[in-house]
């Protein structure tokens, strides 16, 4: 009688240990699966934002942004570069430089310094009025067409139709300017 009770309790303990081992493997698999899926959720989580001074909401995640976001950032960058006066040109250009990719900084800095020198020397005030924006989010290209009004000293404003192209990169939740230049002779 003692032998069969001992065998029976050994079998029960073996079944319990086997069940617990199986449960540990199942839980380990579940934790690994949750870690993988949560990582994707964290990095692909989208946030809808509607800023106070912009009339359309946009969607951003850590790795992607939609066309409305690129449109808003482009309007901000255009304002920093083109809506300037001798008093504001340095601070606007310095803030704009904080968004430029490190590889393009030296070249872009020279262009902005030349523009600032001309603006200060000729007492130029300018304002850009956007008429058309085309956003190509796949390659990060934004084409902007508009009217640039410039006042040189106290003279009447000169008006020119200009087209600018920006190359923007969005990574890690931050926008960088790859290029920002005027497009000429494009048909």
Curated annotation (Swiss-Prot):
Sorted UniProt keywords: Conjugation, Plasmid
UniProt key word Ubl conjugation: no
Domain of life of the organism encoding this protein: Bacteria
InterPro entries documented for this protein: Pilus_assembly_TraE
Pfam family, one: TraE
The keyword ATP-binding belongs to this UniProt entry's keyword annotation: no
Family: Belongs to the TraE family.
Function in brief: Involved in F pilus assembly.
Protein's name according to its UniProt entry: Protein TraE
Gene of this entry: traE
